[in-house]
Amino acid sequence: HVWATLKERDAVIYKDNDFEIFLDPDGDTHNYYELEVNALGTEWDLIITKPYHDGDMVALDSWDIPGLITSVHVDGTLNNPSDIDDGWSIEIAMPWKGLIGNYRSNDSPKDGDQWKVNFSRVHWETNIIDSKYVKTERPEYNWVWSPQGIIYMHMPDLWGLVQFAENTIDQKTVEFKYSDLDKIKWSLRQLYYKQRNYFFANEKYSNSIRELNFFKDLKLKKPPAKGVSWPPKITLTPSGWEAFVKWENKNIIIRKDGKVWVK
């Protein structure tokens, strides 16, 4: 059965069955994009300043993706409980110019560039009562492209990576390359999680790798990439903490609210 109820743009679309796209072009886990569309083609697009669990999050749902085009195809009927449908599909086009304001470049991605991305399909179970779809008391469930191990989409560090290529698949096989920068960011993310656990236990942060038991994970004993200064240097700040490593004459930095960036 294919059904949808919400018709107003920027309504809370996941209250219907929907399809969702999450994009973090620069991979810093902040100021990422979310787009949700239901079977009526109703759109909810927003910028989220940081993940909900990092506090002081703002969801800018007054923002619209410039030039966004969506098209829904229903293989069957919509909102007709009397028959059985095969499903629905959606095609989405987002102009680069609508997204690059949050990207490290003012141009579209180059060959080999990678973005953090995830997809989700929210589904509600229903019963048909008096010829109407009525949700059961069970919560919705999600099918996702890159599983995160938790029913919670707002963990950009756990999203998948999409690599851009100039060649189409019928021209040439393009090798996916897991970048050294992403390996470094992931290792710094482990420090972030250890700081959170330490704070919950001690109500303060630590500038000591030893106190954080950072090397309990044996994989963290080795630098995540060649030429990385290791382990990270931690500084306590008025707002919490920051940590960095040096790599290729740049600093890779992470801070208390999870933002990770290159300077």
Give the positions of each predicted feature.
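Short, surface-exposed charged micro-motifs
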Residues: 34, 233, 251
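Structural preference for beta-rich elements and adjacent junctions enriched in aromatics
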Residues: 1-192, 196, 226, 236
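Surface-exposed, charged secondary-structure patches
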Residues: 220-246
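A short, surface-exposed beta-strand/turn
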Residues: 249-263
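General beta-strand recognition
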Residues: 20, 89, 242-244, 253
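Secondary-structure transition/turn motif
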Residues: 93-96, 244-251
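Short, glycine/small-hydrophobic-rich surface segments
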Residues: 179, 190-224
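Terminal low-complexity interaction tails
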Residues: 201, 230, 248-253
